[in-house]
């Protein structure tokens, strides 16, 4: 079956950086992730304090919310951008289509 993957050592730090970089509270982060109906905001705190590891689907939601690659979040060798671009499609803001 293969070897288990090593746990990212900087995951909690990066998840906190994403939330604060987007200027969101923990409750707002849940809403931004689309998880407000299925998860309590305390779970965000557990992720940020390295008390719980998020699921792959949650990590993908973080990557979408911050408009970064999943590898930027889970690979300790990659850094998140200082200024997060955020999701330009969030709340009805649409990108201009290229012709």
Located regions from the model:
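A short, Lys/Arg-rich alpha-helix, primarily the initiator
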Residues: 1-22
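Residue-level signal for the short linker/turn that defines the boundary of a DNA-recognition helix
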Residues: 10-13, 23-24, 39, 54-57
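Residue-level recognition of specific faces of alpha-helices
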Residues: 14, 43-46, 72
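Key DNA-contact positions within bacterial/archaeal DNA-binding proteins
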Residues: 27, 38, 42, 71
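Short alpha-helical "recognition helix" segments of helix-turn-helix
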Residues: 29-33, 62
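Recognition helix of helix-turn-helix/homeodomain-like DNA-binding domains
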Residues: 34-53
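DNA major-groove recognition helix of helix-turn-helix/homeodomain DNA-binding modules
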Residues: 51, 55-72
